[in-house]
Amino acid sequence: MRNEMNLQFSALSQNESFARVTVAAFIAQLDPTMEELTEIKTVVSEAVTNAIIHGYEGNAEGVVYISVILEEAMVKLTIRDEGIGIFNLDEARQPLFTTKPELERSGMGFTIMENFMDEVEVISNESFGTTIHLTKYLSNSNALCN
């Protein structure tokens, strides 16, 4: 059975935890393992933080959009902003690369997403924003809820 959720919120750093918990609560109905749920929560945190810090450069008037689609044991996440986009996507996806060293950012966001998810697609256009499509196939072990 397919189920879908859409969420939008202001690009404020305090909304990162709201996004993470909301997505986790929605995904819980698939009964993921604790490890799977933790990985998805981490990926949501990374993507939302990137949108707020890099996409909107701290402009709270921006909006972050999240879509979650559940199908059987598959989770599809789309996290989108309408910020400044990514100038050099290949460079941005390199471990430890950051455009904000003064904020003590580690530059591991995309690396974490790629390691925790089964599929990662990043589409970015300068001045039009960034969309990240993430897919995770769950083990379907009935670990948390049953």
From Swiss-Prot:
Signal sequence residues: none
Organism: Bacillus anthracis
Domain of life per record: Bacteria
EC number(s) from the headed UniProt entry: 2.7.11.1
Pfam family, one: HATPase_c_2
Taxonomy of the source species: Bacteria, Bacillati, Bacillota, Bacilli, Bacillales
Top class in the EC scheme: transferase
GTP-binding among keywords: no
tRNA-binding in keyword set: no
Entry-linked HAMAP family: Anti_sigma_F (MF_00637)
SS bonds (residue pairs): none
Keywords (A to Z) from UniProt: ATP-binding, Kinase, Nucleotide-binding, Serine/threonine-protein kinase, Sporulation, Transferase
GO term, biological process aspect, one: negative regulation of sporulation resulting in formation of a cellular spore
Function of the protein: Binds to sigma F and blocks its ability to form an RNA polymerase holoenzyme (E-sigma F). Phosphorylates SpoIIAA on a serine residue. This phosphorylation may enable SpoIIAA to act as an anti-anti-sigma factor that counteracts SpoIIAB and thus releases sigma F from inhibition.
Gene Ontology MF: a single term: protein serine/threonine kinase activity
Homology family: Belongs to the anti-sigma-factor family.
InterPro entries: Anti-sigma-factor_SerPK, Anti-sigma_F, HATPase_C_sf
UniProt protein name: Anti-sigma F factor
Catalytically driven reaction(s): L-seryl-[protein] + ATP = O-phospho-L-seryl-[protein] + ADP + H(+); L-threonyl-[protein] + ATP = O-phospho-L-threonyl-[protein] + ADP + H(+)
